[in-house]
């Protein structure tokens, strides 16, 4: 029987797969394919992580069928592969298969939540930091906007609730602004800002965390003041 890979080999594999995702983020398909080949040489073409990488490349090229197949095969080998569940959820959402998307989003939420304590995502100092930056972001708005939002509560929750995810909401969202979505004078202030601390802390640290909290708050506030997704992308709030 083959020996399991060493920790050093696993770290090297993680690095290669991270390179693959960075290449895709930069639009470098050839670089991503080279990273995938390197990963295959290390652990074989049937490894769940390799299948995940292959699915990401397929998604980038518009081949949803291959992406779904590879992700399902990855989950056959590792049913608790949270990233594979999440990517499947996103694909099914795009294909307007809501029930399948929700199924995989719920699995993502459950699997992510298991790791919260292990990854120390409940650190009080970091959670307090998120709240502070969120309030500072609101207070720094021009007066006419800040005044309308000053009394809006900022609530911190680890992740979106199961009930919310059952509606198709992204289990890895960073925040939610509940209330009216058009900044008209004749509507009341929004109910609340919710920031999902575990999702933020799982992805960012230090200055990047503060920048993302600010972007998340501004994105949700933008909805309230009537900005659409194109407006927010143009302003760097997407």
What is the predicted function of each stretch?
Residues 39-40, 73-74, 108:
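Canonical positions in the second alpha-helix
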Residues 42-43, 77, 94, 111, ...:
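Structural marker of alpha-solenoid helical repeat scaffolds
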Residues 50, 84, 117-118:
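TPR alpha-solenoid repeat register
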Residues 176-214, 224-238:
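Active-site scaffold of zinc-dependent metalloenzymes
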